[in-house]
Amino acid sequence: MKKIFYTVFRNYLRVIHNVIYYRRVYILDKHNIPQQGEPTLVAANHQNALNDPLALQFSFGNNRVSIFARADVFKKKFLAKFLYSLDILPAYRMRVDGEASLVHNKVVFDEAGQRLLSGGIVAIFPEATNQDKHWLGEFSQGYLRMAFETAEKEDFKKNIQILPTAIHYSNYFSMQSDVLVKFAEPINLAEYYELYKTKPRTVWRAVNARVKASIDNMMLNITDLDNYDAIDYIRNTYGVHFAKTKGVNPDNLPNKLLTDKVLCARLNELKEQKPDEMAEIYSRFLKLKDFTYQEKLRDWVFDTNYRVMQLIKDALILVLLLPLYIFALWPHIFIFYAPTKLTNKFEKMGGPFKMFVGGVRFVVSALFSIPIFYLLVFIIDLIFFDLGLAIIHFLLLTILGRFAWYYRKYFIKFMGLCKFTHKIKRSMQYKYWTNERQLLFEKLNKLIFE
C-alpha cells in the first residue's frame, strides 16, 4: 500500500513539475546514465535550493533517487515530511548547522551507502550550499569519502560510478520557465580503488577535480564575479542577438546555454585583452539595466517596431479573450498568489535565501493550493451542475490555468509596448537609452567578432 501511495504521489508531483510549474523540461544525454542496478552517485551543481533536488528526482524515469539537501530546510515539519517522501535526505554542514550536528551525517551517509550497494541512485551537491548565481563554487570532498568507504565495506567488489550532472534554468524564480538537466560520461571509481588503499586523499583530490571539471564543462559558470551583474545582463539582452547570429533559436534553452557559454568566454578574453574598454562597457550596460528596471521595461521592447494598427489588433484579441480569462481565473488567481507571503519573505532576505522562492512556490502549490482549490471546483460543479460537466471542467483546469498565465503575460507585454511606443516619441530619456543600447550592441559586435 505504501509503495502504491509513493508511486501515485510521485507521479502527481511529476505532472505538477513538468507540466504546470515548468514550460519545458530538457533532460540531455540520458544515455550516460548507468544501467539500472549499478550503484550510481550523482554529483550536481547547486543553484536553485529546492528546485534542484526536484529537477534531479524527475530526471531518472521511474527510478528512485535518494538526494542530499541542506539540513536546515528540514526544520519545518511539513516540509521535512514532503522532502522525506521524495527520498530527499538531510546533509549537515558545520558552518551552518554547527559542529555538533555533523554526527548525524554518519547515520544518513550510512543509509545512503546501503542504497548504493543495493544498486540504487544517490544524488548530492558537492558545493554543500546553493549559489545565488550562475557560478560553480568550491567542492567538498565528503561525497567521495562516502563513496569510497561504501565500496570498502564490500571489499571493493562493487563498482560505484560518479555521474557528473549540470542543472540550468532560464529563470530561477518564475513559473512556466525552462529547466535543463544534462549528464556527463560517468566516472568509474573502480579504476581508483588500488591507489585509494594507500593514498585516499590523493584519490579524493583527483576525482573531485575531475568531477568538478566535468560539471563546469556542461554548465554556465560566470567566473568573473566582480562583473557578474553586467555579464549576466549582457547575456540576457545582447546574448539573444548573439545567439541569432550563431543561427540558434534563443528560446531553446539547450542551444541558448551553448551560446551563453561561448559569449561569456569571449567576454573574459576581452577583459584580459582590453580591461579599460570592457570596464567602460560593463558600466554602461549596468546603467542601461538600471533604466530598464526603473521603467519596468523588458529588453525586447527596444527591438519591436510596433505600429498603431498592431496595437489595436492586440487590444482586440485581449478584449475577445477577456471572458475566457475571467472564467479561467477561478480558481487560479488564488493558486498563483497563495505562496506570495512566503516567497516575499525569502526575497527580502536576499542572497542565497532568495533561491528558495521557486521551491516554496512549488511546494505550496503542489501540496496545498492546487489540490484544495481543484477539489473545491469539482465539488461546486457537482453541486450546481452534473457529474459529467464537473469531470470535464476538472480535466480542463490545467489548460485553463496555463491560458490564464499566458493571457496575463500577454497583457503585461501589451501594456509595456503601449508605454514604450508612447514614450519613445515624446521622451528624450527613452530616445537616449534606445540609442545607447544600439551603440553598446554595435560595440560588442565589433569586439566579439573582430
Segments from the language model and where they lie:
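Extended catalytic-interface subdomain
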Residues: 148, 163-173, 180-185, 194-195, ...
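Soluble catalytic domains of membrane acyltransferases
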Residues: 2-202, 308, 324-450
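Long, charge-rich alpha-helical interaction segments
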Residues: 209-301
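Membrane-proximal, non-transmembrane alpha-helical segments
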Residues: 265-346, 357
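Amphipathic, soluble alpha/beta structural segments
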Residues: 203, 207, 234-251, 304-328
